Amino acid sequence: MLELVAATLGGYLLGSVPFGLVLTRLAGLGDIRQIGSGNIGATNVLRTGRKGLALATLLLDGGKGAIAVGLVWVLLGREMVPVAGFAAVLGHNFPVWLGFKGGKGVATTIGTLLAAAWPVGLACIGTWLVSAAIFRISSLSALIALAASPGFALYFAGPQYALMAAGLAVMGFYRHKANIIRLIRGEEPRIGGKKKTESEG
């Protein structure tokens, strides 16, 4: 029971560090929540025009998921990895420090999956890349990768990891609900095109 609590709290707290907000403030750009979509993720940071800052946010958001999984694996054992992974993405998406208004968790999910079972993470990245090449829509590509992740996890890592991936997929779809509405309406912007509203991040 104590291990479960430790894995959950540790994963959540690491995941809840809002790197996009921290980096934009350190760079003198103000509050990222007042820019673009208001999201704290890398895509919204990119809207500031600072590509390096957006890349740093992407890597740190992915890294915190990987670190949460790695630490729990070493300290508490592999059986607690799915718990820590889910909690890390939960922390990113719903950080207590920001009134539970965070990002969409794509980068943190990928970092979590890469650390928990790297073939699953690579398969999801590959799915995103292929989908993006075909459809040219970032959010749709992320949703396809999320939807495929439980199957990848079941094949490469087993039922526990498939359950974690399914939970992450459900959470990811929920955080992308505005994107899904725009996709249905045919209003979601394409990669490289101009956008009027939020997409990823």
UniProtKB/Swiss-Prot annotation:
Superkingdom: Bacteria
Intrachain disulfide bonds: none
Family in the record: Belongs to the PlsY family.
A Pfam family reported for this protein in Swiss-Prot or TrEMBL: G3P_acyltransf
One cellular component term from this protein's GO annotations in UniProt: plasma membrane
Record bears the keyword Phosphoprotein: no
Gene Ontology MF annotations: acyl-phosphate glycerol-3-phosphate acyltransferase activity
E.C. number(s) listed in UniProt: 2.3.1.275
Pathway(s) served: Lipid metabolism; phospholipid metabolism
The entry's keywords: Cell inner membrane, Cell membrane, Lipid biosynthesis, Lipid metabolism, Membrane, Phospholipid biosynthesis, Phospholipid metabolism, Transferase, Transmembrane, Transmembrane helix
Function description: Catalyzes the transfer of an acyl group from acyl-phosphate (acyl-PO(4)) to glycerol-3-phosphate (G3P) to form lysophosphatidic acid (LPA). This enzyme utilizes acyl-phosphate as fatty acyl donor, but not acyl-CoA or acyl-ACP.
InterPro entries reported in the protein's UniProt record: G3P_acylTferase_PlsY
Subunit composition and interactions: Probably interacts with PlsX.
Residue spans crossing the bilayer: 4-24, 55-75, 80-100, 110-130, 152-174
Enzyme class: transferase
This protein's encoding gene: plsY
Principal location class: membrane
Catalysed conversion reaction: an acyl phosphate + sn-glycerol 3-phosphate = a 1-acyl-sn-glycero-3-phosphate + phosphate
UniProt-recorded name of the protein: Glycerol-3-phosphate acyltransferase
BP-aspect Gene Ontology terms: phospholipid biosynthetic process
Subcellular location: Cell inner membrane
Keyword flag 4Fe-4S: no
